[in-house]
């Protein structure tokens, strides 16, 4: 047995070499974890970046490993350090790029990100985690210390704030390999790193799309509603970590919608339906926008003629630009309850006050005088 084991022992070229990392070098890798966000259980990605010299560990939660999510996450981590590394060592399996037979092909967005922060990149050999052992260990360490048991948060922003605080707490008690406090060695890294650019990097991936006859476009396998007014048109989708922006020719903004991942219904903004309804107000009776409005407002618009519907919908659309769709609908509902057809000036004024904390908000201004005016009860306002 001894002879058999010796005959199969690793040769001198098969062992692991101990690597020494210069200050200003960063390692990046991904891990997986589960969390409940806004009441929904999600499978998320943990983007981890380390500075091996001081053993400083940072992480960000993302919904995907796509290049726009990765660049946005790294930008957040660089912001925590207040500096950008000179060299980033990545896994060959990330969305940043691929190394095949020694030749690296990077994504266009990551190449732009590199140029913005002025760092160099290096890719590990396949199945060679020891080449970036610092971040490999950090993925498991941070997951065990910050994400067990399964955490629950109200939003992704709240989750990432918690991760940032947890990383700061763990780094405060960490020590680097020579026994010094991590914070002491971190100062050496920061002195070797580059200053952050004065302008933030917009991590956006632009994708040409074509709207179908309903005004729907498809991005990464998920449908987004540009609106019926844009049916059968060629459009441009700007895909960011949290949003999808749809542009028409000459950069005209069509819609900005929340980013969705995986399978599910089409993502829509009720306002994208309004232009088509203004042109064809009778279609309001069967429009999906009804589910986004208060029941009283829907009933009021149903009782209006075509001209009244057009006027009401246009006023909601215009007020939404400054105050948001929900505030505009609440304002229009007040006008309808007063027995009048919503108009631009009245809905805009009420919506602005509601959005600023008035209306039904506790401690907000009393809008009863507006209700009285709309019902004809305030004689001085006639």
Residue positions per predicted region:
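Mobile-element integrase/transposase regions
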Residues: 3-57, 65-69, 203-219
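Active-site beta-loop-alpha junctions of metal-dependent nucleic acid enzymes
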Residues: 60-87, 260-266
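Acidic/histidine-rich, metal-coordinating catalytic segments
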Residues: 83-102
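RNase H-like two-metal-ion nuclease catalytic core shared by retroviral integrases
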Residues: 90, 101, 121-143, 159
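Two-metal-ion acidic nuclease core segments, chiefly of the RNase H-like superfamily
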Residues: 103-121
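Active-site-proximal acidic segments at structured loop/helix or strand boundaries
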Residues: 139-241
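Protein C-terminal end segments and domain termini
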Residues: 248-382
